[in-house]
Each structure stands twice: as C-alpha cells, then as structure tokens.
Curated annotation (Swiss-Prot):
Binding site for substrate: 374-380
Name of the molecule in the record: Adenylosuccinate synthetase, chloroplastic
Pfam families the record matches: Adenylsucc_synt
Organism: Solanum bulbocastanum
PROSITE patterns: ADENYLOSUCCIN_SYN_1 (PS01266), ADENYLOSUCCIN_SYN_2 (PS00513)
Reaction(s) catalysed by this chain's protein: IMP + L-aspartate + GTP = N(6)-(1,2-dicarboxyethyl)-AMP + GDP + phosphate + 2 H(+)
Length: 500
C-alpha cells in the first residue's frame, strides 16, 4: 500500500509512506522524509477519507481555554506522562488530550498489562493496552518502542477494534524491530508461576509480561526482527518452548505446538511487516528535526522493578529512566515530565498499601470511582492519598507538574484525609519511603483531615469556580510535595479537565 497523504474532512494530513521490507520509510528510503511528508498539510492529498463526525482534534481545541493551551504548548520538545501510584491513575486521558499538540506519541515499556481507558469526542469508550493513547488524534503518529513486549494477537485485536470504530491505524503505528515478542505460552507460564508461589502470589495480570521479560533477560527471547527470518524462527522458538517446559512441569510442549505456532507467526509476520521500523533511528531522527514527542508511560513508579514495592511490582521500569532505555533516546533530550496521580489511592492485586481504607469507606470509593481494572476487571483496593509515596515518586522522576485526577469522586465525602507521615511503631518518623516490606506492614500513617465540599464539581471548568474546600485540598497537596498541579480531572470525558 502506497499512500503519501490523507485528508480528513477539510484538514489535510499525512500518513503512511511507501512500505519497505525494512519498515516504513520515507520517499527516498530514509526516516527523515517521513516527517517532512507528515507535516506537509497544505499539499494536495492523493486520498480523501470522509467522515460524518466533527474532528476530535477540532472539538478538543475549542474546549481548551487560553491558559490550558498555554500550558500544553509550553511543554518541552520531548515530554512524558508517567504514573505516580500503582497504576490506573488516568494517564491515557491526559495523553489523548496532549497528543494533538505533539507529532509522535510513544510507548516505552510494559505490554498489554497497561490498560488505558480514553473517550473520543462523541463519548465512545476505548480500552487500549498496547496501542498508544494518541491514536484517537488523527494527526498523531504512534510508536511502540523497543522496551515494550508485544503480544501480536492482542495488538491485532486492538487495531481491528479501532478500525471497526472508524479510527485509522494504517501508517500511523510503528512497532520497534527490537521489541520482544510475547507468546501465548508466556501467559500460560504466568499462571503456573502464580500457582507455584501459592500464598505469596504477586497478583499479576497474567498477561505473560513477567515471563516475557524473563526470556529477554536470559537471552532466549524472540524479537520482532526475528519474524523476518522464518527459516531459523522455528529453531529459536523451539529453544524458548523447550526451556519453558523444562522449568514448569505443568507446561505441556510437543511438536504439534511448535508447528502450530510457527504457522500462526508466519501469518502474523506478513501482517505486521508494514508496521515494523527501526524506531531508535526513527525517534532520534525526529528529535534532530525538532519534532514534538510525547512519551506515554504504562503502570506507574510504585510498580517499578527497582523503586516499587518489590516483589509486588511489574517487570519493567515505568519511571523516568525507562523512557531512555525503552526508546533509545538520550537522557539530555528528555524535558518536562508530568506525573499523574489520583485524588485518592488505588491498587490492584497484592502488596503493601499503607493508606488503604479497610472498612465500608473503601467500598464507597471503589463504586464512586468505578475502580475496576481496565485490563483484568478486578476490583481495586482503595485508600487515602499517600503523600509520602507521592513525594518519593516526584523525587525519582523530577516531575515538572502533576495531573490530579478524579477529584470529583471525593465530592460526597464530609471530610477527606491525607496520609502525610509514616511512623515507626515507637512513634519516630521515617525520613523516606522504605524498601523493607516488613517495615511497611508495621508503620503507622499520620493523617491530616480536611473538610469535604459536598457538591458536584463535574461541570466546572475554571479552577477559581471550584468550592473553597476543593481548592484547599489541591493546594495542600502542592504544599506537601513541592510540585505544582497544572491539570485537574473532574470526570472521564476529554473536556472534563481544569487547567490550573
């Protein structure tokens, strides 16, 4: 398929260039030409795509006030959106809103365990797991970086679902040739591993993320680039499957499984080829051409393999450092990072949760906020906002600003608590977020109690129009962590955002 430019309604945009055996290249076989075409909005399009609905980007632009537009446009060339808690903070919505002002939105780590829920201009809900949230913005190119583990059946299912709902993906998604392939058997092993751990289970999404990263680290994993060499693909896959069978007696492997998988992946390879690219070269080329790049983090810092509540963590680095290793870009080019944090705290699965509300209050938050996992559907544990953990996340990532989400969920509460200090059993204060899980189980949390506002704030769009108690809550968080809150979510829709 050779498409040079597309036009949606009255706005010309560019999309896929000529496909090539080595990925999506520009008109002269280089990645740089790809960007030149992507930005040529005034040239006559060769293909017209008609739409009966208004452009989401136009609707969004009209919904952003002057101060909001100024906030967005002031973000650095390479910016990022990262989670500040244990995931599910609402990162996808902010990425979706910001994407219109960026040329590229990129995923750098994780896999289909990252569930991002976003809504289009008509209020239709999209649950994405691998495809970057910028896909709903027609002029945005989406990149799945080398640090992501890719389950091809899941990726194709997402693409098919988007296409069926009028969202064009062809020529708008690049998949790194260095990304590792996540197979169905990785998911099976994930379940066997949880059963093996019995009572000490980690509570994974069972999407095969950990086993796939394990294959990567012990160096017998397969990468997207291996799909270009189907002559030796069966031998590599046989080695991987044999290793899994040796490690897990419950995993049954035989010649039929290998034969079936090879046939499946021959078809997958053919379908994936137009999306494959050397994204490391692509991203650095984009940076040198001053293209604006938005990095979308999956999961969150408190699930980081190094900085999270280990071992109750994910298998990648959803912190600032994961941006560089997961995309192949230099630390010096990474600019503003926006941390996304709920106005309260949630967590899915096992692991320490110091500010968890164990009584009916937790249930009230869960149902008011519809706290059920995008990926698993599991009910999330709920608690008060943990300032100690949030300050730790801000320290690690160096956030320029924060997006406080779901402030509207707290509207019916007579009073709201903030967990401001951790104390040892003897009453002495901890100076930092501890790595010791036993200590985390023993600590006592000291709370500040603030008044609630007992009024619906979901239709408010100006910060000064918020109830005084709501503003005091926001400003107290800023005082405690020392990072400004620039975005406040007061509902799930794209327009339900206050720019502060």
């Amino acid at each position: 398929m050779n498409i040079s430019t597309l036009r949606l309604d009255s706005n010309p945009i560019t999309t896929a260039t000529a496909t090539h055996r080595n990925g999506i290249l520009g008109c002269n076989g280089t990645y740089s030409c790809r960007f030149n075409q992507f930005q040529q909005r005034k040239k006559t399009p060769s293909v017209i795509v008609c739409s009966t609905k208004p452009l989401a980007s136009v609707v969004d632009h009209q919904g952003v006030n002057e101060s909001g537009l100024s906030r967005i446009e002031s973000l650095s060339q390479v910016s990022g959106v990262l989670g500040c808690q244990w995931g599910d903070e609402g990162k996808g919505k902010l990425v979706d809103i910001l994407a219109k002002h960026f040329d590229i939105v990129a995923r750098c780590q994780g896999g289909a365990n990252a569930g991002h829920t976003i809504y289009n201009s008509e209020g239709k809900k999209f649950a994405l797991h691998l495809v970057p949230s910028g896909i709903l913005n027609e002029e945005t190119l989406c990149v799945i970086g080398n640090g992501v583990v890719v389950h091809l059946p899941g990726l194709f299912k997402e693409i098919d679902g988007l296409e069926a709902n009028g969202v064009s993906c062809q020529g708008r998604i690049l998949v790194s040739d260095r990304a590792h392939l996540l197979f169905d058997f990785h998911q099976e092993i994930d379940g066997l591993r949880e059963a093996e751990l019995a009572k000490s289970f980690i509570g994974t999404t069972k999407r095969g993320i950990g086993p796939c990263y394990s294959s990567k680290v012990i160096r017998n994993g397969l990468r997207v680039s291996d799909l270009r060499h189907m002559d030796i693909f069966p031998q590599k896959l046989d080695l991987l499957l044999s290793d899994a069978a040796a490690r897990f007696p419950g995993f049954k492997y035989g010649p039929d499984m290998l034969r079936e998988e090879v046939e499946r992946y021959k078809k997958f390879a053919e379908r994936l080829e137009p999306f494959v690219a050397d994204t490391v070269h692509f991203m650095n080329d984009a940076i040198s051409q001053k293209k604006k790049i938005l990095v979308e983090g999956g999961q969150a810092t408190m699930l980081d393999i190094d900085f999270g509540t280990y071992p109750f963590v994910t298998s990648s680095s959803p912190s600032a450092g994961g941006i560089c290793t997961g995309l192949g870009i230099a630390p010096r080019v990474v600019g503003d990072l926006v941390g996304v944090v709920k106005a309260y705290t949630t967590r899915v699965g096992s692991g320490p949760f110091p500010t968890e509300i164990m009584d009916k209050g937790g249930d009230l938050l869960r149902f008011a906020g519809q706290e059920f996992g995008t990926t698993t559907g599991r009910p999330r544990r709920c608690g008060w906002l943990d300032i100690v953990a949030l300050r730790f996340c801000c320290q690690i990532n160096g956030f320029a600003s924060l997006n406080l989400t779901k402030l509207d969920v707290l509207s019916d509460l007579p009073e709201i608590q903030l967990g401001v200090t951790y104390r040892h059993p003897d009453g002495s204060a901890l100076n930092s977020f501890p790595s010791d899980l036993r200590l985390l189980e023993q600590i006592k949390v000291e709370y500040e109690v603030l008044p609630g506002w007992k009024s619906d704030i979901s239709s408010i769009r100006k910060y000064t129009d918020l109830p005084k108690a709501a503003r005091e809550y926001v400003e107290r968080i800023e005082e405690l962590i020392g990072v400004p809150i620039h975005y406040i979510g007061i509902g799930p829709g794209r327009d339900a955002l206050i720019y502060k």
